[in-house]
Protein backbone atom coordinates (compact mmCIF):
# COMPACT_ATOMS: atom_id res chain seq x y z
CA UNK A 1 0.00 0.00 0.00
CA UNK A 2 1.34 3.42 -1.00
CA UNK A 3 0.59 6.34 1.30
CA UNK A 4 1.38 10.03 0.92
CA UNK A 5 3.82 11.77 -1.39
CA UNK A 6 0.97 13.50 -3.23
CA UNK A 7 3.11 16.58 -3.95
CA UNK A 8 5.83 14.51 -5.62
CA UNK A 9 3.39 12.36 -7.59
CA UNK A 10 1.46 15.42 -8.78
CA UNK A 11 4.68 17.10 -9.93
CA UNK A 12 5.71 14.01 -11.88
CA UNK A 13 2.25 13.57 -13.39
CA UNK A 14 2.17 17.21 -14.51
CA UNK A 15 5.45 16.73 -16.33
CA UNK A 16 4.26 13.48 -17.85
CA UNK A 17 1.12 15.19 -19.14
CA UNK A 18 3.16 17.72 -21.13
CA UNK A 19 3.87 15.06 -23.81
CA UNK A 20 7.18 16.74 -24.69
CA UNK A 21 10.68 15.83 -23.57
CA UNK A 22 11.01 16.12 -19.81
CA UNK A 23 13.97 15.44 -17.55
CA UNK A 24 13.52 15.17 -13.80
CA UNK A 25 16.25 14.63 -11.23
CA UNK A 26 15.08 12.88 -8.06
CA UNK A 27 17.47 12.74 -5.16
CA UNK A 28 17.56 12.48 -1.39
CA UNK A 29 18.98 10.43 1.43
CA UNK A 30 18.81 6.66 1.35
CA UNK A 31 15.57 5.03 2.48
CA UNK A 32 13.33 8.12 2.15
CA UNK A 33 11.14 6.59 -0.56
CA UNK A 34 12.55 7.80 -3.88
CA UNK A 35 12.22 4.44 -5.61
CA UNK A 36 8.77 3.87 -4.07
CA UNK A 37 7.60 7.22 -5.47
CA UNK A 38 8.92 6.33 -8.92
CA UNK A 39 7.36 2.85 -8.81
CA UNK A 40 3.99 4.31 -7.84
CA UNK A 41 4.24 6.92 -10.59
CA UNK A 42 5.16 4.52 -13.42
CA UNK A 43 2.85 1.63 -12.55
CA UNK A 44 0.36 2.48 -15.32
CA UNK A 45 2.83 3.86 -17.88
CA UNK A 46 5.17 2.64 -20.62
CA UNK A 47 8.47 2.49 -18.78
CA UNK A 48 12.02 1.31 -19.26
CA UNK A 49 13.32 0.93 -15.71
CA UNK A 50 17.04 0.48 -15.18
CA UNK A 51 18.75 0.30 -11.81
CA UNK A 52 22.49 0.89 -11.84
CA UNK A 53 24.81 -1.36 -9.89
CA UNK A 54 28.07 -0.61 -8.17
CA UNK A 55 30.10 -2.46 -10.79
CA UNK A 56 31.78 -1.66 -14.08
CA UNK A 57 30.57 -0.06 -17.30
CA UNK A 58 30.19 -3.39 -19.10
CA UNK A 59 27.88 -4.84 -16.43
CA UNK A 60 25.75 -1.70 -16.31
CA UNK A 61 25.47 -1.58 -20.10
CA UNK A 62 24.41 -5.25 -20.17
CA UNK A 63 21.78 -4.54 -17.51
CA UNK A 64 20.56 -1.44 -19.38
CA UNK A 65 20.32 -3.49 -22.58
CA UNK A 66 18.24 -6.09 -20.70
CA UNK A 67 15.92 -3.37 -19.40
CA UNK A 68 15.38 -2.10 -22.94
CA UNK A 69 14.80 -5.63 -24.25
CA UNK A 70 12.26 -6.29 -21.48
CA UNK A 71 10.34 -3.28 -22.75
CA UNK A 72 10.84 -3.89 -26.47
CA UNK A 73 10.29 -7.64 -26.61
CA UNK A 74 10.56 -7.90 -30.41
CA UNK A 75 14.32 -7.30 -30.30
CA UNK A 76 16.29 -10.48 -31.05
CA UNK A 77 17.05 -12.47 -27.91
CA UNK A 78 20.56 -11.76 -26.69
CA UNK A 79 20.69 -8.35 -28.37
CA UNK A 80 22.99 -5.96 -26.62
CA UNK A 81 23.99 -2.41 -27.30
CA UNK A 82 27.68 -1.74 -27.78
CA UNK A 83 27.62 1.59 -25.94
CA UNK A 84 25.41 3.74 -23.75
CA UNK A 85 25.18 6.15 -26.67
CA UNK A 86 23.71 3.43 -28.93
CA UNK A 87 21.27 2.37 -26.21
CA UNK A 88 20.15 5.91 -25.43
CA UNK A 89 19.83 6.75 -29.13
CA UNK A 90 17.52 3.74 -29.49
CA UNK A 91 15.37 4.80 -26.52
CA UNK A 92 15.10 8.43 -27.65
CA UNK A 93 13.98 7.25 -31.10
CA UNK A 94 11.42 4.84 -29.59
CA UNK A 95 9.97 7.80 -27.72
CA UNK A 96 9.35 9.73 -30.93
CA UNK A 97 6.29 7.56 -31.49
CA UNK A 98 4.78 7.64 -27.99
CA UNK A 99 5.38 8.75 -24.43
CA UNK A 100 7.94 6.54 -22.68
CA UNK A 101 9.39 6.99 -19.22
CA UNK A 102 13.08 6.07 -18.88
CA UNK A 103 14.15 5.67 -15.26
CA UNK A 104 17.82 5.38 -14.39
CA UNK A 105 17.80 4.58 -10.68
CA UNK A 106 21.06 4.63 -8.71
CA UNK A 107 22.44 6.93 -11.41
CA UNK A 108 25.68 7.69 -9.48
CA UNK A 109 26.72 4.02 -9.69
CA UNK A 110 26.34 4.03 -13.47
CA UNK A 111 27.95 7.43 -13.98
CA UNK A 112 30.98 6.52 -11.85
CA UNK A 113 31.44 3.31 -13.85
CA UNK A 114 30.95 5.06 -17.20
CA UNK A 115 32.77 8.39 -17.02
CA UNK A 116 31.30 9.60 -20.32
CA UNK A 117 27.66 8.88 -19.45
CA UNK A 118 26.79 12.45 -18.40
CA UNK A 119 28.20 13.95 -21.58
CA UNK A 120 26.52 11.21 -23.63
CA UNK A 121 23.19 12.06 -22.02
CA UNK A 122 23.88 15.73 -22.73
CA UNK A 123 24.50 14.93 -26.40
CA UNK A 124 21.37 12.77 -26.70
CA UNK A 125 19.16 15.34 -24.97
CA UNK A 126 20.44 18.17 -27.15
CA UNK A 127 20.03 16.07 -30.28
CA UNK A 128 16.57 14.61 -29.60
CA UNK A 129 14.71 16.84 -27.14
CA UNK A 130 12.58 18.56 -29.79
CA UNK A 131 11.40 15.35 -31.48
CA UNK A 132 11.22 12.93 -28.54
CA UNK A 133 8.41 12.42 -26.04
CA UNK A 134 10.81 10.77 -23.59
CA UNK A 135 10.36 11.45 -19.90
CA UNK A 136 13.82 10.86 -18.40
CA UNK A 137 14.14 10.37 -14.65
CA UNK A 138 17.57 10.17 -13.03
CA UNK A 139 17.46 9.08 -9.40
CA UNK A 140 20.22 8.84 -6.85
CA UNK A 141 20.89 8.63 -3.13
CA UNK A 142 24.38 10.10 -3.17
CA UNK A 143 23.21 13.65 -2.57
CA UNK A 144 26.66 15.17 -2.99
CA UNK A 145 27.14 13.35 -6.30
CA UNK A 146 23.73 14.38 -7.63
CA UNK A 147 24.26 17.99 -6.57
CA UNK A 148 27.86 18.23 -7.83
CA UNK A 149 27.67 16.12 -11.02
CA UNK A 150 24.08 16.50 -12.20
CA UNK A 151 22.63 19.74 -10.83
CA UNK A 152 25.74 21.95 -10.57
CA UNK A 153 26.47 24.75 -13.03
CA UNK A 154 29.65 23.05 -14.30
CA UNK A 155 28.01 19.63 -14.77
CA UNK A 156 27.38 18.46 -18.36
CA UNK A 157 23.66 18.03 -17.63
CA UNK A 158 23.24 21.53 -16.20
CA UNK A 159 20.40 23.40 -17.88
CA UNK A 160 18.82 20.27 -19.33
CA UNK A 161 16.61 19.19 -16.45
CA UNK A 162 13.07 20.44 -16.48
CA UNK A 163 12.45 19.65 -12.80
CA UNK A 164 14.12 18.33 -9.70
CA UNK A 165 12.67 16.70 -6.61
CA UNK A 166 14.63 16.55 -3.38
CA UNK A 167 12.78 13.87 -1.44
CA UNK A 168 12.69 14.52 2.29
CA UNK A 169 11.69 12.12 5.07
CA UNK A 170 7.97 12.14 5.87
CA UNK A 171 6.69 15.03 7.95
CA UNK A 172 4.81 14.04 11.09
CA UNK A 173 1.28 14.39 9.67
CA UNK A 174 2.15 12.40 6.56
CA UNK A 175 3.79 9.69 8.66
CA UNK A 176 0.65 9.46 10.80
CA UNK A 177 -1.23 8.15 7.76
CA UNK A 178 0.82 4.95 8.11
CA UNK A 179 -0.59 4.37 11.60
CA UNK A 180 -4.31 5.24 11.41
CA UNK A 181 -5.27 3.06 14.39
CA UNK A 182 -2.56 4.39 16.71
CA UNK A 183 -3.40 6.85 19.47
CA UNK A 184 -1.82 10.31 19.10
CA UNK A 185 0.88 9.54 21.66
CA UNK A 186 1.76 6.24 19.95
CA UNK A 187 1.99 8.03 16.59
CA UNK A 188 4.47 10.47 18.09
CA UNK A 189 6.54 7.59 19.48
CA UNK A 190 6.46 5.75 16.13
CA UNK A 191 7.54 8.91 14.28
CA UNK A 192 10.54 9.25 16.56
Language model regions located:
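Phosphate-binding site recognition
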Residues: 1-192
Amino acid sequence: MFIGRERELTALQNQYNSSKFEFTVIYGRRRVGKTAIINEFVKDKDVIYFTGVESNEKQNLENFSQSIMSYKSDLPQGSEFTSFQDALEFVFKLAQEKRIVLVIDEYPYVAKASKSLASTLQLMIDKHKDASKLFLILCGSSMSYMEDHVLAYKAPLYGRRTAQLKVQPFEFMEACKHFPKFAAEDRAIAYG
